[in-house]
Amino acid sequence: MPVVVQKVLLAEPRGFCAGVEMAIKALTWMTRVFPPPVYCYHQIVHNASVVAAFEAAGVIFVDDIEAVPSGARVMLSAHGSSPEVGAAARERTAVVVDAVCPLVTKVHHEVRRMAAEGYDILYVGHEGHDEAVGTIAEAPRAVTLIEPQRG
């Protein structure tokens, strides 16, 4: 027998996932330990007030790891990064804190494993989103991005 839902209530405010909470704590630690600027590869969270507070504390958010000066301190966001971005960060910076969410790390591991076993992988996500970019980069020949339908 189908269930009819008449009303859905959304909690306000909704909190961040555990991975983002961990990344926020890590970036807060970096702003306390290191003098500004501290760099963060991509915005730590899709929340303007949190990003603004970190910018006020001396964090510079970049969308290209090459924009981080040599010898700087950088955090990789909770959404995950491609292996190439992680390698470039470790090569050019003094300190790298990889704050990728453990659940994103698990997805990356599973994508690599399944690709190595010969599977074709369908990844449902949004083109250009940090999580999708990082995940697809783990096995680009094996992963096909599927954009969810809106509406």
Task: Enumerate the predicted regions with their spans.
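The feature marks the mature, well-folded catalytic cores of soluble enzymes
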Residues: 1-151
